[in-house]
Amino acid sequence: HEVKQIPFYAVGTERSRDGKELLGENFAYLISVDTIQDKKSPFYVNGCYFELKEFRRLIKKEYAGFEIKDAGEIKIKETDRLGYVLEIQAGNQDFQGEEMRELLKLPSSCFIVQTDKEMIRFLCRGVGHGLGLSQWTAGKMAEENKQYQEILNYFFPGLELIEVEMQKNE
């Protein structure tokens, strides 16, 4: 038996992300499943606002050479099929969506950007990376009296759940 990594996140979009598409062949067991219940979460949509000078300061903390003159210099270059940002350009720098999420402490990399000259708004859907088990949907399944095995099999079909006895180190 092989132990698999089973990632989780708080709230996603209408579907979880596809592990094979995102991370490669070794994560083919992380398939995209319906998480439409996430839309009912109070944390499904979040607006995060930054003045241009604050945005610049936050990025410069990690990238000293970062320059941006106008909020209009922020452009999403690539998203996955669910809308998670894969690549975004800001000023003189390109970033991965997850990297931008970490730099700005955004709830999710599933976002759109709206700007005027001095203000930037990130309209984010979900909380977390969207890969694996949605805690919100899993919680709703539990409220419907689904057992943990059924919940795990829904998010990770094809994986076998086994009991493992842990030995104490003496």
Question: Where do the protein language model's features map onto the residues?
Answer:
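Conserved, single-site charged/polar hotspot
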Residues: 1-170
